[in-house]
């Protein structure tokens, strides 16, 4: 296994690994540790079936049931279908037309933050990129005066608030969830600054689209604090833009990274991904359920 840097601050490419080797527990553990340490890892030319993807996901941690069941694989409720190809593998591919929207896959669901697998089956020629931002590098670079506004800040993340917004966008195939699914993910109160359980480095932990409330602040003041922080974390120097190729696999850490889609400007071109969100192996609660 060879590791090559992709960005001065975070992100590495792993080479010398074949798809069939990803079922080896020791290798999966090494890949997970590398993702924790560097924020994300990229493996290219990895031919994954749904079966192989799930085998790897189970070695990386605890794969979570897809939070929108209609967009999951017919054999694996943990395997989410992303893209614009309609019905695939017995499920419907989830199409988010929102564009740039920074988040982490751990907020708003009460999960112990772990990693997410994104695997590219089909991608447009010159669109459909994914952005990653380093939350620990951003923390390390911020001066103490500005940090003081965030060290003790807490926010209420709500997956339902986020899903309602996504359902309102034109062209999406996402619907407002009914009561049983809404109750599945109670709001969580999370510290904006957290210590990564593996690296022990402080990181920012925030998903602005999911923020329902900033504890102790008016809506306007709280929103200003959150958006100023997100604009800082996502400055160009902290961001890596990935241009996908088919058979690319990225595994990213949901504390050390924020990520975002880019504009939906590839109508007429196919895009299809597997996504598996994997909660941390330490089930200790990161935030608190309300």
Predicted regions: what they are:
Residues 1-249, 255-290:
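Non-heme Fe(II) oxygenase catalytic core, chiefly the N-lobe of the double-stranded beta-helix
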